């Protein structure tokens, strides 16, 4: 063992001490550089001029090089002095000479600021409501209504009244055309809600429950028959056969021998192009979850008797009656083009329960919209410089979840005659439309589709705003809004309390169907495996004991 005096001192120090030393070194070096720059001295050594001894004119070359070096130094000093003088003059020119010049400068800056504000307002107007674009889209919709014989208005099943256009319906009725309401996206709402909306809307116009296909292939798009809707999460189309039947009934009852044109209209992003692709069973129109994909009318031949007309989505409402927040919540404007995405989030949090939002995004309790967006920004990693949360990015994330259906919601139909949105349709018109399309003949198939939807308890945890009290003004429930339920589409991960229970077939729950033979065979099989393992262990143990006893006998 080495002597104690020969052992070297360990260089290991604590991290705090090492960081402290490094910080002091940095501060010292910074101070030295600052002093050197102030005094005009530098530690940088000048590069020596080296000339080979074999050169015949070495002395003259060295003298000439020194003279050039001095000239370069003089030019650099002169440039520094000129730059210093220029900075001083510029600083003097920026200072106002008198009160009048100060006022003129302030007015100039105010004019520049007003120009910036005006340009920002024009940019917001362009992103939200472009008058030329709206007029162009509106003319395309009017053209569709004029040339079509039957109009199918596609509604979002989550908010049918919010996606319904009264002006389009008035144009259809004035033109003597036939109108059919198609309730799309029924897989996003519970069964009871769909039944109530069908009952409410059928009192005004013929209404069909529908689910457009979400498959991405170009052809052979799948569809379900109305009687076998057993998977609510399928990407196939549901209800296409019923649409074809009512159109065929209309042609037969009106004795139309030639083809008819069917116009498909509706708000942006309600699924008009997806409905046409589902009926055609191939990708005939471009689709996407962003508004403005369809920019002009497009005619698609369904068969020899039916031609479908796809129209661009537009909200035909006067600009003074148009609420920009409602437009954003209906996905009529691209989320990336919104200059203030936080305002729609206020409306979302007024319509849904705090527990639903906390469960969906896995957040702690919050008392305001700003606090919620700050927590969500940290949760999804949207941070600015200095670890400040990017609330705008978090608000856009919430809007995207709202528009794509991840944050599920649905509205409740109003009572007959109590809603401001009620459209009064004469009873003669309702009965005439029902007879022409023979709605009673497809009632049974419609009921089968609705019965195949999940119950409210399967996917929905309804929020009752009367059971909660919130002291914060920003989180207060908006009583003027339509009755609406918002739920989380987030699935709970991880083990549950029922994981420890044995998994048994569902058929055993039926009375008189216990499958005794199958259970007996399974139990016998497990018992055989267990006895076989026990026998193997006993054999190994006996072999080891025999070897030990044999070795002891040989030694004796």
From Swiss-Prot:
Species of origin: Caenorhabditis elegans
Occurrences of domain CP-type G (ranges): 138-317
Family (UniProt): Belongs to the TRAFAC class YlqF/YawG GTPase family.
Disruption phenotype: RNAi-mediated knockdown results in a reduced body length. This phenotype in suppressed in a ced-4 n1162 mutant background.
The protein's name: Guanine nucleotide-binding protein-like 3 homolog
Any GO molecular function: GTP binding
Example GO biological process: nematode larval development
Entry remark concerning the domains of this protein: In contrast to other GTP-binding proteins, this family is characterized by a circular permutation of the GTPase motifs described by a G4-G1-G3 pattern.
Chaperone keyword on record: no
Biased composition (Acidic residues): 466-478
Binding site for GTP: 184-187, 266-273, 310-313
Top-level taxon of origin: Eukaryota
Function as written in the Swiss-Prot or TrEMBL entry: May play a role in regulating cellular proliferation in both germline and somatic tissues.
